[in-house]
């Protein structure tokens, strides 16, 4: 798992270095695809439940599962790149939200505080603790910075399966009381918003999730 996670992180760095105005998310997908193969792995999203690309690229108001396409990124956009590699029998998953050129102060705050919220959620986890301590830490930080917490999409178990049984809400859910034990592997991937955390219906592609109010995430 550590090797797969490290490989995913290296791929994300390579893709992130290419993020710039005028670059298309299709081009980012191509970079990720080739980098994944160069590692000796396979891009986990490709053909997963019909998903057509090797990474997810979620721009501006897209919460998650954005499908790369031919539209160029423009100055001031923000884009989340979500990389997962299948390597040596297990999946490694990581993502980051990146600024395209210069972005506004609100967008910088969103990027920074979402990362801090994720780190605080990770720090809260530990053997013998219920999984809901993760969401409690994330939600507390988000609300302190007046950011919305998307509830429809949550972290998940990962390992030999891309998505396994454990569920990791990014908000405090008393019912999420699975006790964490050594050896568990799961994702912590909070999706925070500048406005309402409510989701609009999925796009016609059946993947792309966006904020109902069109605010950035």
Description of each model-found segment:
Residues 2-217:
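Active-site neighborhoods and metal-handling regions in enzymes and metal-associated proteins
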């Amino acid at each position: 798992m550590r090797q797969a996670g490290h490989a995913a992180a290296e791929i994300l760095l390579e893709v992130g270095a290419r993020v710039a105005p005028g670059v298309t998310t299709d081009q980012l997908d191509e970079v990720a695809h080739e980098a994944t193969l160069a590692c000796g792995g396979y891009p986990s999203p490709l053909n997963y439940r019909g998903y057509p690309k090797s990474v997810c690229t979620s721009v501006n108001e897209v919460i998650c599962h954005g499908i790369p396409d031919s539209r160029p990124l423009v100055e001031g956009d923000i884009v989340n790149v979500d990389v997962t590699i299948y390597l040596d029998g297990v999946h490694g998953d990581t993502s980051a939200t990146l600024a395209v050129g210069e972005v506004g102060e609100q967008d910088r705050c969103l990027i920074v505080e979402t990362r801090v919220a994720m780190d605080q959620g990770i720090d809260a986890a530990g053997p013998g603790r219920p999984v809901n301590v993760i969401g409690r830490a994330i939600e507390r930080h988000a609300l302190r910075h007046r950011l919305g917490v998307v509830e429809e999409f949550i972290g998940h178990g990962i390992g030999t399966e891309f998505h396994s049984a454990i569920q990791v809400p990014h908000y405090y859910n008393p019912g999420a009381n699975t006790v964490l034990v050594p050896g568990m592997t799961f994702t912590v991937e909070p999706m925070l918003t500048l406005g309402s955390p409510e989701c609009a219906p999925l796009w016609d592609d059946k993947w792309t999730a966006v904020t109902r109010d069109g605010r950035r995430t």
